[in-house]
């Protein structure tokens, strides 16, 4: 999977519906703190009006192929959600070799380990610092991206996930048969 070229303009993207859960207010504050960086929200939603920083583009709803292409052009994937389950867009970004920067909530923390395969942030300053490092794309950031990509292949591929589900169902069936 090719990553965005390192000489491409520094772009940060997120993907999904613009709702309270996805924390567009924080996304906007982060963008406002980094006016030299372009931010793209791929999607739409009832809180679109909160994305007021001049360096934010909201695509509206686009076809899946276009959403993937837009994400591929970005260097960084940002997920500042207030809560998550297992965020599929995060897994996809890891597969696309994006530097991932996420909020410190269950779901995100289940997948991203701070400064191992991305950044887990709690404060505006932490997000800004992580994005600045991603813009520079130092050796650590490249290592996090590679670690995240290898983890996707080893932990979240279809075969691996089917095997994990099979184990869960087998344990449940065995427990039922014992009772």
Region spans (language model):
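Short acidic/histidine- and often glycine-rich active-site loop of Leloir-type glycosyltransferases
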Residues: 50, 91, 105-115, 119-121
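Conserved donor-binding/catalytic core segment of Leloir-type glycosyltransferases
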Residues: 4-22, 28-32, 39
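Nucleotide-activated donor-binding/catalytic signature segment of Leloir-type glycosyltransferases, i.e.
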Residues: 49-65
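A short, well-ordered alpha-helix in the C-terminal region of glycosyltransferases
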Residues: 140-155, 164-167
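Short alpha-helical donor nucleotide-sugar binding micro-motif in glycosyltransferases
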Residues: 61-62, 69-74
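Short hydrophobic beta-strand element within catalytic cores of glycosyltransferases
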Residues: 99-102
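Conserved acidic donor-binding segment of nucleotide-sugar-dependent glycosyltransferases
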Residues: 114-125, 133-139
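Aromatic "clamp/platform" in nucleotide-sugar-dependent glycosyltransferases that forms part
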Residues: 82
């Amino acid at each position: 999977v090719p990553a965005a070229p390192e000489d491409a303009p520094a772009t940060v993207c997120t993907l999904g519906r613009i709702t309270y859960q996805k924390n567009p207010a924080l996304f906007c504050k982060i963008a406002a703190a980094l006016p030299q960086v372009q931010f793209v929200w791929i999607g739409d939603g009832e809180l679109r009006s909160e994305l007021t920083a001049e360096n934010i583009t909201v695509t509206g709803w686009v076809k899946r192929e276009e959403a993937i292409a837009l994400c591929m052009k970005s260097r960084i994937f940002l997920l500042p959600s207030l809560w998550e389950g297992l965020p599929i867009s995060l897994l996809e970004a890891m597969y696309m070799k994006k530097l991932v920067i996420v909020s410190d909530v269950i779901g995100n923390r289940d997948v991203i380990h701070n400064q191992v395969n991305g950044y887990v942030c709690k404060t505006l300053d932490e997000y800004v610092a992580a994005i600045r490092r991603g813009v520079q794309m130092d050796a650590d950031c490249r290592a996090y991206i590679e670690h995240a990509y290898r983890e996707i292949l080893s932990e979240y591929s279809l075969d691996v996930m089917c095997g994990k589900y099979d184990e869960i169902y087998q344990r449940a069936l065995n427990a039922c048969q014992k009772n």
